[in-house]
Amino acid sequence: MPENPAAEKMQVLQVLDRLRGKLQEKGDTTQNEKLSAFYETLKSPLFNQILTLQQSIKQLKGQLSHIPSDCSANFDFSRKGLLVFTDGSITNGNAHRPCSSITASESLPWTQRSGNEDFTSVIQQMAQGRHIEYIDIERPSTGGLGFSVVALRSQSLGLIDIFVKEVHPGSVADRDQRLKENDQILAINDTPLDQNISHQQAIALLQQATGSLRLVVAREVGHTQSRTSTSSADTTLPETVRWGHTEDVELINDGSGLGFGIVGGKSSGVVVRTIVPGGLADRDGRLQTGDHILKIGSTNVQGMTSEQVAQVLRNCGNSVRMLVARDPVGEIAVTPPTPASLPVALPVVATRTLGSDSSPFETYNVELVKKDGQSLGIRIVGYVGTAHPGEASGIYVKSIIPGSAAYHNGQIQVNDKIVAVDGVNIQGFANQDVVEVLRNAGQVVHLTLVRRKTSLSASPFEQPSSREAVAEPPEVPELTGSLKPETNSRMEAEEIGERLDNLRKDTVQALEKPDVYPEDIPGCPENELKSRWENLLGPDYEVMVATLDTQIADDEELQKYSKLLPIHTLRLGMEVDSFDGHHYISSIAPGGPVDTLNLLQPEDELLEVNGVQLYGKSRREAVSFLKEVPPPFTLVCCRRLFDDEASVDEPRTVEPSLLEAEVDRSVDVSTEDDDGELALWSPEVKTVELVKDCKGLGFSILDYQDPLDPMRSVIVIRSLVADGVAERSGELLPGDRLVSVNEFSLDNATLAEAVEVLKAVPPGVVHLGICKPLVEEEKEEKEEHFIFHSNNNGDNSESPETVHEIHSSLILEAPQGFRDEPYLEELVDEPFLDLGKSLQFQQKDMDSSSEAWEMHEFLSPRLERRGEEREMLVDEEYEIYQDRLRDMEAHPPPPHIREPTSASPRLDLQAGPQWLHADLSGGEILECHDTESMMTAYPQEMQDYSFSTTDMMKETFGLDSRPPMPSSEGNGQHGRFDDLEHLHSLVSHGLDLGMMTPSDLQGPGVLVDLPAVTQRREQEELPLYRLPSARVVTKPSSHVGMVSSRHANAACELPEREEGEGEETPNFSHWGPPRIVEIFREPNVSLGISIVGGQTVIKRLKNGEELKGIFIKQVLEDSPAGKTKALKTGDKILEVSGVDLQNASHAEAVEAIKSAGNPVVFVVQSLSSTPRVIPSVNNKGKTPPQNQDQNTQEKKAKRHGTAPPPMKLPPPYRAPSADTEESEEDSALTDKKIRQRYADLPGELHIIELEKDKNGLGLSLAGNKDRSRMSIFVVGINPDGPAAADGRMRVGDELLEINNQILYGRSHQNASAIIKTAPTRVKLVFIRNEDAVNQMAVAPFPVPSHSPSPVEDLGGTEPVSSEEDSSVDAKPLPERESSKPEDLTQAVDDSMVAEQEKASESPDSAARQMKQPGYSAQVSSSSQEIPSAPAPLCQSTHADVTGSGNFQAPLSVDPAPLSVDPATCPIVPGQEMIIEISKGRSGLGLSIVGGKDTPLDAIVIHEVYEEGAAARDGRLWAGDQILEVNGVDLRSSSHEEAITALRQTPQKVRLVIYRDEAQYRDEENLEVFLVDLQKKTGRGLGLSIVGKRSGSGVFISDIVKGGAADLDGRLIRGDQILSVNGEDVRQASQETVATILKCVQGLVQLEIGRLRAGSWASSRKTSQNSQGDQHSAHSSCRPSFAPVITSLQNLVGTKRSSDPPQKCTEEEPRTVEIIRELSDALGVSIAGGKGSPLGDIPIFIAMIQANGVAARTQKLKVGDRIVSINGQPLDGLSHTDAVNLLKNAFGRIILQVVADTNISAIATQLEMMSAGSQLGSPTADRHPQDPEELLQRTAD
């Protein structure tokens, strides 16, 4: 049996993990099942109990040998397996006394009786000449022995000795009169406490002793007459009260709580009211209900309220020591404790000299007089509590302010310890409490200070081992127990790290044997470590050395927090965050090993573990080391001392950013700004003056979690109200941090508080303290991370009723009309829902302010998860891409942008055109605000151009120094669009109209024309298209803007294109020449155009440019404008009948068009497809600014209607300081530092610089095959790219840094954001290792030279760049894809597939997938927790793609599909069917899931969109498997290859489809399990949900990293939520489930359904389960079944006519017996019957499901005619009657069947035509018109 089962078990689990990882790397999955079973067995609670029980039995053997023969050994085992000793005579609630865990593996050594000479010699040796006394104490039937002990380190070899700390008055020991304080216990029950007995074992011996307790103690000869109590000063009760019994109770909190409740108050005292059964107090057995609590630790709690006592208990840490009393005699009259005002005496530190009364300290009193309201002028820093055993605890003077009272006094020195203020002893006070005491002191302040004498003077920060306390008289040294705490959460009577140094006010008799501290022992390893690090770090840091030996006998200590932390922290009980070589404790698990020390705390830096320095190592190295290092652990940590620093008598005006920056610098002091990684704002506070008017200040705010301190949030400017006070001032920008309003500091203020402060400010001048975002070259690479979002969106911790109240205040002092309607939030953790819903505006709102909410599309994927726990990201039934959802969440709309209430009618997409005509044709449709909204589902051509009405949609949010999409970088890659009418899909998926250029900072106006670029997201990797911007002349502005996208989702309602599908897309690049269009008005008919835009800015670029103008949003076909065929969506209107509109407002444009005569003459510009000259790469960064005079002249000429000339391509984005070159010396130093940083890594380190071209670096990247390791490998190099031209990079190189930003060991999110935001000149640090090829998640492949590929990410990491591949048509994306299992949902629309969550998907990567055989990708990282074996990489050779897009299909080895008319043939379940679908004017309208690289292992239709061609065709259903597409075999293809094949389909699509016989699953084909998540206050569940567009079912679409679901680890994307807290949500809508999840609190139990992995295959023999949803399968389409019925009837008729009537086709009837339970599915489908669509043919078996009970008999066959059921003949029965018979048949079912050859032939051709109408589910609830319902029913 192992000595420490818990530790041994953890080691075995780690070995298993490593073994599994190595097998996975080798691709060996043969042992997965065995290893998984072994792993689960080790982790099971039963196994843990067995281990605990074994340990307890071993302990029992050791304990029984020490129980006196005259005492009975009553013991038991708890439910956890712990050994519990009980005394049969114990009564009155004291029957349970758990045995403390004895960590030594061997049993306690047997020793001889006291008469033995060996025993006597041992005792004499231990006594060292002191007086020895033998004491027998009889344990009473109730209560304890009446004394407490403390463990102190002895002077001999550093051993631990046990001393009597206190003898309680009136106790057994006190009445015996022999046991004295400070006695050293040498033996307990004849067991000497030598080096073989640990202090835990000694404590256990005292606790477990029954009957007589025999003690051998040693006592100093001169101190045998010591006081009996040391606490009389604090515990003396009024003379009117006498207690019958007092007891000292110590409880060691194991993380589950103390287990008792209190009640009472100041007058009556605090009384124990309840004791929780099975809780800690109950198990301890000493505390009883009705006990009065007199003291807690050294704090007298008499006279306190119950709440104050509760607070004292909470502050005690793990060890809680209480003095309780019961059985009062006389009247209880408790008086509150008075402040100690006794003279302050000199504390005496124990020395090795016996009887020494000398003191190294001197004390003195100082009187300070505050003058003219000044402060005292001292800064203090505190060590408070027992968090620093052995350290100099107390309040010290940190610094003295020159010119202050303390400065002029001259007596106070830095490092003086303050022990009293105005006679009030402040020892033990918290730092902030001392500050308050000093502030509240009068004009004259008396301070009592302690200072080391000159000869011994040293900084307390350098020698924190000094232990002082106020003592009286001075010459009496104090007994203080300073120990290195050992981890054992079941020590019940031991004093660990006593609080005597700062809490005790009583006097303690001295030991003549002095205290010895670890720090005082010259050879102590802890002291050496501490000294070494203190010398390295200097006096500003406190160094702590802790030793952990995680020998936890009860393994539940680990279990209770094992799910919260990674494996490497299980043994330590803490998690570590790493930043640039520093490793900080980010969280400590309650009850874990580190927590029990009560020494370390979050933000402490981990310097060294077991002699190995972690400082300077990467996170990967540190984590790897922590996984492997064996216990015991010696941890060296440091803490910056002035974290708690405060200025006395002065407000805390020090900006938190300063302290945070200092914390981040930690140890590394260099010229490099190491703290810049998280420092978002400048520490400099700028004061901005705004004049508040009746409309308010004109900006909105949000709260944002401070990345430097997860426990606090900061207030950030979210957006500016158009033409508001803030915008007009020009000094306030979105992204600025708001730190103060007038004199009120917003530091640590909540969002609601900040709103109230801003609201309460009276009109007039308002002074705002603002911190600007940092803009530095080092930070440019990570600027995209710092897009702000709120950690508390107001709804996390609020009830649903209050959510809208908080959000409605985000816009401050908006005009009254904006606040008329309540802001209704229907989302969970998200402030809005469906962008396609109509908006409700009031006309006055639109005119009075053009403030409008707009979505910020470009949130960094890394930041979306950092510090956030998002519960639901729900966009009603529309599935907006998740990166967009997070954007929406981060930037809630102002309250006046209202979502319609739940009662508002939702306009169906199909009704869009009718609604528009009805709403707009009655008047001038140009009055956009007269309509209820221009946002509902417009006709396709109206949606396509997504510049919204500016009054409604002006984007105002942006960040000053953070490019919205830095990945575009102005590289000039042209977007290709079919038409501007497809721009709607681009807006939905990430628009950016510009990027910053160096010239943007110079000159008042810059002409900018921006290319279309693609944006890709981490995880989702959705192709996101950028809009080619309208050419406008912009005016300078410092605001950042985002493209208006409120229309985005409505614009993307239809997944198909209505016109021009499959056309070659022209390469639009710039505005063409102006042209004149005349439109003749018709009576009572509107012109038929709608416009968008105006004088307000549609788009603000990062450099301050503004895009504005009037654009055509939609042209109605049958209108006068539509008939001209000269205007189209996206055209810019320059002039109307002589009125220049280039700088006109929206209202002016509307009026101009209204007032124009007949005809109306428009001067418009359209985007031109003329090729544009692209500047050379070398000139990109150095494009001179536009001539300012020229720009000014052009700007002046605008009002004369002249069209601007075609724009040139802007230079690539550069950081403002990018032109500043590092000196050679600095560069050399940096390179040297980099080489030192990675010196320990195997391989050859390279540092190179590359210049990106228009296509990026020309690299393809992938992650590590082992998902637990974060790597970024080069898997492909484009021969035409910069990397290939440079020649120094090779395939297999691992990127470590880019532009001084560390990628090594960082998450994919971090790496992606850094890579994407890199400027043009890129400095790369990479390492070359021969073994890298074996670690790469994707096999290396060459990048075709004709493909201008950027840096691309293939293995779950982000793409480095995201420019389009010009060889791929950038088709418009559909708005929706469904998130289904394995986060691989795709929407097949037209010739493209929109991907939601699969990694590595964008036009350029799609092209590469088509061109490169062998390409595969990992499943995104959110699926790491899938319990099944990882999907192997797809190694098959995929279909080659020719330049024209035609595929060479590999030969199929599957059986030949049924060959019938593919245009009309039905899909026969169980057979491969060839079908053809003509797409017409729309796309296919499918979404797919699966692939060989996913657990689904097949390409499966997830949903059929009712607007698409597949739905019109009517044959494809959700759940059908696609085997081939136009000859391309998808049976063994990866997910991306299927996307590629479906994207390239021509007008007529030829598909090979397989419909599983058991496709429409019951839940038996789902793995159903329960998941319990704890929803904490203010936090969400950390998951996103999505509903099917048609049908029911809600699925998990995303797991937020760091959230509750992610930490639990069991949920994955695609899981279906079946119930929430027992409430069935299978049929519930997405909104309903979102509401339920939003409202639940506390423990949330989710019932989850997950498709069994590997249930799909490409043949009927192995395909048994289905991905298809049983409800959505029918609701997703309504097939046109006329051809089906016709073909079936023809088939039946042909068969009948071809068979000779005289020939008997029947065999003898067979009797089949089936036993069916109530929960069983029968598993057969039947067809035929009277009135059947096939005709009146006999009822026969059309399908047998493999998982049904019928199949188990193996006696039924497809085609068998059913003669009778349970004796009832079926002749003449209708199909429905037969179905009902089978439905209701349970128990023993007798079927008589006949093998009819005619029927068999029909059945063979049909091959079980449908599995849709399972009798186990209500068939009537589904579509009875479906052909499957008419032809056959399935009987369960």
From Swiss-Prot:
One GO BP on record is: regulation of microtubule cytoskeleton organization
Q: Which residues form the PDZ domain?
A: 134-221, 248-328, 365-453, 555-641, 687-773, 1074-1166, 1245-1328, 1472-1555, 1568-1650, 1709-1795
* Compositional bias of kind Pro residues: 1203-1214
- Source organism of this protein record: Rattus norvegicus
Quote the function comment for this protein. Scaffolding protein that facilitates the localization of proteins to the cell membrane. Required for the correct formation of tight junctions and epithelial apico-basal polarity. Acts (via its L27 domain) as an apical connector and elongation factor for multistranded TJP1/ZO1 condensates that form a tight junction belt, thereby required for the formation of the tight junction-mediated cell barrier. Positively regulates epithelial cell microtubule elongation and cell migration, possibly via facilitating localization of PRKCI/aPKC and PAR3D/PAR3 at the leading edge of migrating cells.
**Polar residues bias locations:** 456-466, 1173-1191, 1415-1426, 1434-1448
Which parts of the sequence belong to the L27 domain? 1-65
Q: Which InterPro entries match?
A: L27_2, L27_dom, L27_dom_sf, PDZ, PDZ_scaffold, PDZ_sf
Return the protein name: InaD-like protein
Q: Where is the composition biased (Acidic residues)?
A: 1219-1228
| Residues that bear Phosphoserine | 455, 459, 482, 647, 1217
> Which body tissues produce this protein?
Abundantly expressed in germ cells, also expressed in testes and seminiferous tubules, with faint expression in Sertoli cells (at protein level).
Protein location: Cell junction, Tight junction; Apical cell membrane; Cytoplasm, Perinuclear region
Q: Which residues carry this modification: Phosphothreonine?
A: 1545
- The answer to whether the entry has keyword Phosphoprotein is yes
What is the primary gene name for this protein? Patj
Which one Pfam family would you cite for this protein?
A: L27_2
Subunit (UniProt):
Forms a ternary complex with PALS1 and CRB1. Component of a complex whose core is composed of ARHGAP17, AMOT, PALS1, INADL/PATJ and PARD3/PAR3. Forms a heterotrimeric complex composed of MMP5, LIN7B and PATJ; the N-terminal L27 domain of PALS1 interacts with the L27 domain of PATJ and the C-terminal L27 domain of PALS1 interacts with the L27 domain of LIN7B. Component of a complex composed of CRB3, PALS1 and PATJ. As part of the Crumbs complex; interacts with WWP1, the interaction is enhanced by AMOTL2 and facilitates WWP1 localization to the plasma membrane.
State the membrane topology: Peripheral membrane protein
Keywords, A to Z, come to: Cell junction, Cell membrane, Cytoplasm, Membrane, Phosphoprotein, Repeat, Tight junction
Which residue windows does the record flag with biased composition (Basic and acidic residues)? 1372-1383
Could you state one GO cellular component term attached to this entry?
protein-containing complex
Q: Where is this region: Disordered?
A: 456-492, 1173-1232, 1341-1448, 1657-1678, 1813-1836
Question: What the record says about its domains?
Answer: The L27 domain (also called Maguk recruitment domain) is required for interaction with PALS1 and CRB3, and PALS1 localization to tight junctions.
Which range is the signal sequence, renumbered to this chain?
Answer: none
